[in-house]
């Protein structure tokens, strides 16, 4: 087989090398969840530029086990060179941590107005949001009227002054002005949106819910656990609800981060997976009889080390990757269009790489998904003259694949 397997991060976590702070303040480290404690690329990106006396704040507001989640990340930071005595846990949560029976973390719900907790934010050079449920974080940091609490104002002031803001999973979802709060792809494409104050039992299933975020990233939407939870469809549906100029989505894989340098106008992928970039600014979409369709979407993917210009979404592949232009692929096989557990599992990167751009005989790829009632969607990915891929380290960079979504009805009958 031509392509090697991506080497995983192994062994003890590396100590991050301290470097002088750059002249580009206010970076964002937006992690897709399930970040390994040994993932030096992600954790070192978060602490990059910290001086020996600089402090870090950890905000566990999204977690259902706030104290445990905070202490876990304190240990991770310590493994990457940040002494625990330089780390402040911000007491902000909305549910009790059952692992600490002597402490009721639900009592921290109002601490976004507490001077002692706000002071932890004000002295931090880097601030991290743990994972959990993003609605918990916004419930704690936004007032009932949607305005910012004093702690959120302090967070925005620190970010403007150069502090790094990072977060994983739910901590990534809150980064934008509008955030994805609930839903899965198939339901998002076949059911109407639900109100941001509606009750829904799970974050990962059901109809799409959008809600106000915290607004650190002034562009588009972020989705996380992206490839493993098949969230391309829900991201496309969510983007259709934004103003046209804002319709840029970033889908961050697990154990991976998008590192955004707002001052320089660039973003870089770091970690074990990739970051999908979905451009829907020129897309045409419709919702008819609760079925979503869209055409004119453009899909790209950053592999680790790739850089993205935020101004024009141009991708610069990391050094050492081999470029693959249309018609120049290694493979020559008919791509399968089915899905399900009887077929080999294939992520987005391999579908767009092995089956499309790195495949000399394929310029179009279809994938169909459907539920038990037969309501389904067809994804169509097409190579264009602007498309190219790059391969290195077992990872594909993908540039400018045309993408469309069409509702379908599927009937399944037993063979005679």
Regions found by a protein language model. Name each.
Residues 1-9:
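Bacterial N-terminal signal peptides that target proteins for export
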Residues 18-20:
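N-terminal signal peptide c-region/cleavage motif recognized by signal peptidases
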Residues 63-64, 72, 84-117:
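Functional beta-strand-loop-alpha-helix junction segments that form "active/interaction loops"
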Residues 116, 120, 147-162:
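Catalytic-core regions built around general acid/base machinery
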Residues 128-131, 154-155, 159-179:
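Catalytic nucleophile loop
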Residues 134-148:
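Glycine/threonine-rich flexible loop motifs
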């Amino acid at each position: 087989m031509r392509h090697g397997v991506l080497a995983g991060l192994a062994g003890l976590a590396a100590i991050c090398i301290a470097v002088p702070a750059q002249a580009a303040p206010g970076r964002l480290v937006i992690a897709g969840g399930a970040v390994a404690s040994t993932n030096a690329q992600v954790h070192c990106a978060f602490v990059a530029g910290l001086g020996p006396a600089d402090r870090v704040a950890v905000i566990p507001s999204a977690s259902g086990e706030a104290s445990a989640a905070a202490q876990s990340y304190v240990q991770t930071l310590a493994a990457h060179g940040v002494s625990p005595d330089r780390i402040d846990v911000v007491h902000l949560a909305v549910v009790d941590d059952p692992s600490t029976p002597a402490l009721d973390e639900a009592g921290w719900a109002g601490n976004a107005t507490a001077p002692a907790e706000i002071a932890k934010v004000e002295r931090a050079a880097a601030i991290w949001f743990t994972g959990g449920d993003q609605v918990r974080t916004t419930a704690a940091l936004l007032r009932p009227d949607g305005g910012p609490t004093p702690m959120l104002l302090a967070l925005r002031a620190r970010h403007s002054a150069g502090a790094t803001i990072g977060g994983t999973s739910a901590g990534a979802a809150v980064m934008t002005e509008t955030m994805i709060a609930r839903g899965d792809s198939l339901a998002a494409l076949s059911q109407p949106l639900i109100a941001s104050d509606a009750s829904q039992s799970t974050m990962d299933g059901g109809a799409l819910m959008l809600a106000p975020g915290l607004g650190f990233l002034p562009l588009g939407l972020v989705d996380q656990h992206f490839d493993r939870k098949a969230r391309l469809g829900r991201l496309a549906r969510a983007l259709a609800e934004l103003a046209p100029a804002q319709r840029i989505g970033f889908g961050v894989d697990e154990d991976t981060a998008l590192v955004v340098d707002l001052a320089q106008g660039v973003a870089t992928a770091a970690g074990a997976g990739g970051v999908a970039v979905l451009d829907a600014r020129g897309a045409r979409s419709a919702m008819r009889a609760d079925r979503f369709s869209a055409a004119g979407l453009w899909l790209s993917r950053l592999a680790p080390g790739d850089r993205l210009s935020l101004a024009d979404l141009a991708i610069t592949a990391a050094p050492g990757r081999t470029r693959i232009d249309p018609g120049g692929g290694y493979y020559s096989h008919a791509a399968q269009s089915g899905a399900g557990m009887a077929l080999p599992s294939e992520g987005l990167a391999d579908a767009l790489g092995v089956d499309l751009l790195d495949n000399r005989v394929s310029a179009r790829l279809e994938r169909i998904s459907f539920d038990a009632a037969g309501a389904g969607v067809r994804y169509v990915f097409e190579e264009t003259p602007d498309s190219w891929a790059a391969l290195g380290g077992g990872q594909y960079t993908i540039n400018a694949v045309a993408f469309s979504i069409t509702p379908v009805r599927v009937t399944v009958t037993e063979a005679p």
